[in-house]
Amino acid sequence: MKKTYHLCWSGGEEILFRSRRDYIHGIICLYIAAYESGSLLLAYCLMSNHVHICVRTENKKAFIKAFRYSYTRYFNSRYHRKGRIGERNFFSIEICGLYHLLATISYILRNPVHHGVCETPFGYEFSSARAAFKNEMGYALGASPASKKKHHNQIPDRHKLPPHVLMDREGLILPESIIDTADLEHQYSSVRAYQYYMNKISAEEWERRQAEDKNGKPPIRLEDIEKGIKGANMKEMLANMTSRAHHKMIGDMEL
């Protein structure tokens, strides 16, 4: 039986994604791990030194192990190194209840805003924020999808992507082709609710709504999502949600 989890893999003292190519390959590895384990991705966000994932899976350890192993092989080959990259363990929370799920996904997709690398979740390229309600929000498909054959050298050995997976011309997987968007849109129920959660300031109201799940679980808070991330500053992250728009924000790779 599949259960829903928030999983977080931290780089610790290391940078997991040093370049645009690393992010692109990381998303490929993430999806292959989900596809081959029969897991369903609900949300993801790759930051320079950590990864947040919301996934429905029967075996969270097998899923995250496959993802890390595949990406580590790529990373070690690209940067001529050996051994493990990032923290040995990963952080996980089992998600039970609608409002716990909405809070979890919203925190994951808002992560770049919390870290001050973009002004809205929809402005960050290496997350799945723009996968849901694309038509309602007026988003085009994005860059014209390219044939996967053009990017076969980026796909890990012995793996094949199914026909429905689309890439842009750089090989970046389009999130709407790998996220369970039907489930995600059902959970949020409307584009207005989705936008509300993507932009609402983190507050006690979220905790009160989660209590309505009546599952005996404590509310999901920002500090829970960021637990284990080295250097995470809760006050600063919350301040980034309430500050005035930044005309020039530092990018994640620059950071």
Annotated model-derived regions:
Residues M1-A43, T57-L255:
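Short Pro-Cys-Gly-centered "Cys-loop" motif that presents a nucleophilic cysteine in a tight turn
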Residues N49-T57:
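Short beta-strand->loop micro-motif that forms the acidic, two-metal-ion catalytic signature
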